Amino acid sequence: MIPPLSSLVRYDNPVLVSTSKDKGKGAKGTPGKKGALPPVEQKPGLTQTEDILNSILPPREWTEDGQLWVQYVSSTPATRLDVINLQEKLDQQLQQRQARETGICPIREELYAQTFDELIRQVTINCAERGLLLLRVRDEMRMTIAAYQTLYESAVAFGIRKALQTEQGKSEMESRITQLEGDVKDLERQVQEWKFKCEAIEKRESERREVEAKKHKDEVAYLENYAKQLKQQLETFLVPAKKGAPGAPAAAT
């Protein structure tokens, strides 16, 4: 027989039920369902306690070689020594399984859940009503943890989506930056080309102005020289005419 995994909850010895998957309880009666809890009726204390225990902590079942084995939770009351041993086993399991002391740790959560189940078992044997109340506390804690776990998973998924979106946006932005940098370089090249063209045009215009100025200066000099020559010719022409003009007074003898 292969024993089930060890647990901090105290169980009785395994019982062979049948060679088929028949979930009868055998000598101890039919195990209670996991859903609804049995009402607290005026029954013999041992039977009522076992029914409640089986409802709170369902029996463990496994099959080996076609044989169905069932292991029920123990209905033996716990002593002070049992509680001390439970604490020692808890500390030992936490150390052996390397449970984290802080933060989210499934191993630590599992071991503390088993410890709480064992405490519920011990309390239920002494007082069924207190056991059922602790069961409600346990279920409420589990629902709260499940809600926080769902919220945490949703937050993680949201964070991953945002990270992927940011990464995608980053890639697009980097591509856009590369494109804009290329455009800037192209514009700088065009500016440089136009700058060279402007310098060439200014140089040509400067040379043209110099040529025009020199040409204009030469023309002015030529015209001044020509006017001077004409003036001299006119003066030369007018002087003899004045000397031989009729009616001019005779020179004194």
Swiss-Prot record:
Annotated InterPro entries: Axonemal_dynein_light_chain
Coiled-coil ranges from the UniProt annotation: 160-239
Any one GO MF annotation of this record: dynein heavy chain binding
Region (Disordered): 19-44
Gene Ontology terms describing biological process: cilium movement involved in cell motility; inner dynein arm assembly
Any Pfam family: Ax_dynein_light
GO cellular component terms listed in the entry, alphabetical order: inner dynein arm; motile cilium
Places the protein is found: Cytoplasm, Cytoskeleton, Flagellum axoneme
Keyword set, alphabetical order: Cell projection, Cilium, Cilium biogenesis/degradation, Coiled coil, Cytoplasm, Cytoskeleton, Dynein, Flagellum, Motor protein
Similarity comment: family membership: Belongs to the inner dynein arm light chain family.
Record's function text: Plays a dynamic role in flagellar motility. May be necessary for stable assembly of a subset of inner dynein arms or for the binding of these arms to the outer doublet microtubules of the axoneme.
Protein name (database record): 28 kDa inner dynein arm light chain, axonemal
Biological classification of the source: Eukaryota, Viridiplantae, Chlorophyta, core chlorophytes, Chlorophyceae
